Swiss-Prot record:
GO terms for molecular function: 4 iron, 4 sulfur cluster binding; metal ion binding; N6-isopentenyladenosine methylthiotransferase activity. One of its GO terms (cellular component) is cytosol. Its main location: cytoplasm. This is tRNA-2-methylthio-N(6)-dimethylallyladenosine synthase. The gene is miaB. Belongs to the methylthiotransferase family. MiaB subfamily. SMART domains: Elp3.
Amino acid sequence: MKQVVQDLDVLPAAPTAAEKAACDLPRITEERNTGKQRKLYIESYGCQMNFSDSEIVMSILTEEGFDTTSTPNNADVILLNTCSIRDNAEQKVRHRLVHFKGLKRNKPSMIVGVLGCMAERLKAQLLEEEKIVDMVVGPDAYRDLPNLINEVDSGHKAVNVFLSREETYADINPLRLSGDGVSAFVSIMRGCDNMCSFCVVPYTRGRERSRDAHSILNEVRELVANGYKEVTLLGQNVDSYKWSAEGTDERVNFAQLLERVALVDPDLRVRFSTSHPKDITDEVLYTMKKYDNICNSIHLPAQSGNTRILELMNRTYTREWYMERITKIRQILGDDCGISSDTIAGFCSETEEEHQDTLSLMEFARFDFGYQFVYSERPGTPAAKKLADDVPEDVKQRRLSEIITVQRQLSLEHNQAQIGTIQKILIEGVSKKSEHDLKGRNSRNMMAIFPKKNYSKGQYVDVLITGCSGGTLFGEIVETV
């Protein structure tokens, strides 16, 4: 699962250096001042699951006497919710920690802590060797934060990176990071059992466990009651969601959960992320087709287009299997279904011919957009232990550039095909480029920009698409008389 930064007139799959820096910006806490004694500041990096976790942390700590601030200098507690998926993500956090260590010189009582995947992976280095944090807290230990903060207040370092087989935070009502009141993340499961050879997630987030379906539906109903118009169901692999009620015959798989959420309110848009190609079922696809409010968009990471490389990655499917899934999606949901992907360039021992297989798979699938990176070896993973990271860096970068070029063209063609059509858009807010324009997305997850007129966020509007760039649609609201 990768970070999505809205309102950028760029293609997420293919950023320039400046654009990529913008896409990697963290989400930070907003100002909330209710007169409480202490201030909390959180920076959240990486995937949507991290953003969702930060909302859980905010909820826990606001119950313990914290307001939130958007300014680190004003904070009593600074928390970085971190990502370990790539080395540069970790380096970015390290630079921020050094900066916050400087702030502590002027405010010695300030607590600096690391949450999330880096906490689990680098606890000893961060606490004992580099001495740049006061507290290290893993993804399953957020309930313990009040105790850990008290420990630091008492003059000690604090750590809890215990991985749970049960924790889902099902009973905690998240405090939303985004104040737009339109879209919200709803976590439905935690952890991952897939054990891809390149990935640290199973080691930093633990094994899969699914959240109580009733608590998910209660959270969705509360969001609707509070005026939210869109939810995104989150998990490292949502299609493997399986929950059963203890002592009863009730069993709920992902397709059934998706249907239950769709039935909460026909005006509530429902998205989900991320899907593993081996687990997305025809039942899920037919459920999407059945309900108009389930968005016609699927994030289906391919990672590579070559079967040998996929086997080395332990993805448990072949090129042909992935292509069959794409064909089935098109058969059931039509060519209007938006499909996006993740791709790794230059994985261990990848040949030029195997790289060409990835390019041809992209052409076959015709992805709307994607997130693509060069392979970054992560210590402790099976790939790091058993495979040589032997593709030269300049070759990785050249292959990434070729992947980006193909994706830019595919995305532009998809957007050009929308010109002249009328799209139902959910308004998410004012465009960052012009206060006179609004921004919003269609069911296919395409961003559109259009003149504001008398409309505002949270409304659905019909927009006639009149133009596009590689990453954005442009249009005019069609008003019915």
